[in-house]
Amino acid sequence: MKLAYWMYAGPAHIGTLRVASSFKNVHAIMHAPLGDDYFNVMRSMLERERDFTPVTASIVDRHVLARGSQEKVVETITRKDKEEQPDLILLTPTCTSSILQEDLQNFVNRAATESKSDVILADVNHYRVNELQAADRTLEQIVRFYIEKAKTQNDLATIKTEKPSVNIIGIFTLGFHNHHDCRELKRLLTDLGISINEVIPEGGSIKNLKNLPKAWFNLIPYREVGLMTAKYLEKELNMPFVATTPMGVIDTAICIREIEAILNFTNQSKIDKEPYNFEDYIDQQTRFVSQAAWFSRSIDCQNLTGKKAIVFGDSTHAASMTKILAREMGIRISCAGTYCKHDADWFREQVSGFCDSVLITDDHTKVGDMIARVEPAAIFGTQMERHVGKRLDIPCGVISAPVHIQNFPLGYRPFLGYEGTNQIADLVYNSFTLGMEDHLLEIFGGHDTKQVITKSLSTDSNLTWTIEGLAELNKIPGFVRAKIKRNTEKFARENNISEITIETMYAAKEAVGA
């Protein structure tokens, strides 16, 4: 456990609650002290939904510590069972309440005898896993529970649908543009003649989990959540899955070809059927629907060729974005990174050959220092990299959770599929400062009234600029001023100069060979 004012992935119970609150008619009970129960506020603030967050906190206070938790937890479960009448009640501790080492499974067993709802305990080690790993595990646990329940009741729907169908697994609340991606995936799959069997957990009913085996295959758009469920269904029910994220023109085509291979394999028993071939669709979409392929050959995109960028985010979005920028737009990726340390090997394999260096860390200060050191033309990252970019005057496009309210847009903004390629192209182009715009504003917009502000990430600087030095700095065009200021301050620190004059600026210029 560590104290931080910013975490890329939250504690495990947040992931469990995200999955539980994504399903319809599932109620989560959080056994936690005050302070751990911020999920309701966070979800209500960020998600553009009208329903209440179905999470109740069973508060651990001094009375509970004195008498034990069993009575209160069981009473909360049975009360919510009567009030809400959910299909499932999911009990989860937090990392704080786990310290008490209580037998919560025993509480669940007792409450289950008094409740009409199913009651389960989230099987997550709160000290070993983060939010995303816990979400993946909880989704798999819920699916496993209902598949096994359907098996014992001989109620499992194992007969495949007549026409190709798919389960989309991993769309859930507070995800990065997940609702928009889901709509785009449905449109893409419908174009291919594939019907949607189930979408879980977002908007899914646990009563329908027994119907998962009816689909021909499972689609996992994000590695972070859904992969464990897909592997379980493959092992138990022999269901194939596609885990290639259809992000960018090239990977979308790869994903469609993988789907084509699965459909032809599943369909091979039907002798009279023509094999599925989606090459014409890929060609049509790439050339005429997606503007990204055309844009990447335009003079606008060629202006970006060779520019330096940094990418950081969850493993799915960071890896995909790195490949799109390098392969499809010719942008040089100085560093690609992810905070998903548990997925480091896969990430390194994906970005190998597309970037100069790889950074695997969940420490935002290391990411900030790396950005300050590299001084890229643009950053593509999370909300935190957006903050860093503002402090360093480097533009940033947000491409991954965690994000704030700006990235829960009301308009349609998918990142997956062919429409997603258009959104990404817009984001990339608009993130780079256009050539001379800053300079032209200064020339034609009157004299520059902007005060020079500190662009270094360290706030303990004791450097001072003389009036003459600042006046000279203000004469420098805005689009290179920040870089020159940083280089001058770096030179001053290295040479123990506390007051920066015009002479210091010229000495720094000579030192860097400019």
Swiss-Prot record:
This is Light-independent protochlorophyllide reductase subunit B. Its main location: plastid. Protochlorophyllide reductase is composed of three subunits; ChlL, ChlN and ChlB. Forms a heterotetramer of two ChlB and two ChlN subunits. [4Fe-4S] cluster binds at residue 36. Signal peptide: none annotated. Pathway: Porphyrin-containing compound metabolism; chlorophyll biosynthesis (light-independent). One of its GO terms (molecular function) is oxidoreductase activity, acting on the CH-CH group of donors, iron-sulfur protein as acceptor. It holds the Pfam family Oxidored_nitro. Gene3D superfamilies: 1.20.89.20, Nitrogenase molybdenum iron protein domain, Proto-chlorophyllide reductase 57 kD subunit B. Its EC number is 1.3.7.7. Component of the dark-operative protochlorophyllide reductase (DPOR) that uses Mg-ATP and reduced ferredoxin to reduce ring D of protochlorophyllide (Pchlide) to form chlorophyllide a (Chlide). This reaction is light-independent. The NB-protein (ChlN-ChlB) is the catalytic component of the complex. Substrate binds at residues 435-436. Its cofactor is [4Fe-4S] cluster. It is found in: Plastid, Chloroplast. GO terms for biological process: light-independent chlorophyll biosynthetic process; photosynthesis, dark reaction. Transmembrane segments: none annotated. It catalyses: chlorophyllide a + oxidized 2[4Fe-4S]-[ferredoxin] + 2 ADP + 2 phosphate = protochlorophyllide a + reduced 2[4Fe-4S]-[ferredoxin] + 2 ATP + 2 H2O. Binds 1 [4Fe-4S] cluster per heterodimer. The cluster is bound at the heterodimer interface by residues from both subunits. The keyword Iron-sulfur applies. Keywords: 4Fe-4S, ATP-binding, Chlorophyll biosynthesis, Chloroplast, Iron, Iron-sulfur, Metal-binding, Nucleotide-binding, Oxidoreductase, Photosynthesis, Plastid. The active site is at residue 300. GO terms for cellular component: chloroplast. Belongs to the ChlB/BchB/BchZ family.
